[in-house]
Amino acid sequence: MGRGKIEIKRIENTTNRQVTFCKRRNGLLKKAYELSVLCDAEVALIVFSSRGRVYEYSNNNIKSTIDRYKKASSDSTNGGSTMEINAQYYQQESAKLRQQIQMLQNSNRHLMGDSLASLTVKELKQLENRLERGITRIRSKKHELLLAEIEYLQKREIELENESVYLRTKIAEVERLQQANMVSTHEFNAIQALVSRNFFQPNMIEGGSTGYPLPDKKVLHLG
């Protein structure tokens, strides 16, 4: 049969308690020594008996080991402080971002003409100046686009007029050939239809969807 499990509790008998202390103390010191040798660990052990007597073991200078422990403990505490500082920093940055978002939202509402009751006369004047500058930029861009569109339509007008001149020349040539009985009536009518279709394209562009007047053009008539 194996040994029964010993209940861990305070030994009431003083003699037995002292004997047990000596045995366990020696075993503990032996284990500390073995740990330092086998594992190349820095070990320091301090034991105070119930009578106040001190027993110690260290494979290094015990004071040096204690100082090393204090430093390690201090670094650990500072690490916790660093984490707290970082947490506070991110909380402050988050609050700043929320404030900036709120300011931008208020600014957008003001630009839309909303929530103006809280603004002073000076702030309203500043808002008015911002809107006027914005309108000026918008009008400038609009004018730029209109000029580009008019320029394109003018170029297209010239192209169509050149086509019209070319077709007038062709129709005159066909008429001469018809008079000489070299072109049939069917072919002549087909050419006339083609000329008419191309001739009316400039007029369609004049009344296009832009809604902006074009410069006066010289209209060429066929025939």
UniProtKB/Swiss-Prot annotation:
Transmembrane segments: none annotated. GO terms for molecular function: DNA-binding transcription factor activity, RNA polymerase II-specific; protein dimerization activity; RNA polymerase II cis-regulatory region sequence-specific DNA binding. Residues 87-177 form the K-box domain. It comes from the Eukaryota. SUPFAM superfamilies: SRF-like (SSF55455). GO terms for cellular component: nucleus. It is found in: Nucleus. Residues 1-61 form the MADS-box domain. Pfam families: K-box, SRF-TF. InterPro entries: MADS-box/MEF2_TF (IPR050142), MEF2-like_N (IPR033896), TF_Kbox (IPR002487), TF_MADSbox (IPR002100), TF_MADSbox_sf (IPR036879). GO terms for biological process: positive regulation of transcription by RNA polymerase II; regulation of transcription by RNA polymerase II; seed development. Keywords: Developmental protein, DNA-binding, Nucleus, Transcription, Transcription regulation. Expressed in flowers and seeds. Expressed in endotesta cell layer of developing seeds. Signal peptide: none annotated. PANTHER family: SERUM RESPONSE FACTOR HOMOLOG (PTHR48019). Probable transcription factor involved in seed development. Plays a role in seed morphogenesis by promoting the correct development of endotesta cell layer, which directs the further development of the seed coat, the endosperm, and consequently the embryo. This is Agamous-like MADS-box protein AGL11.
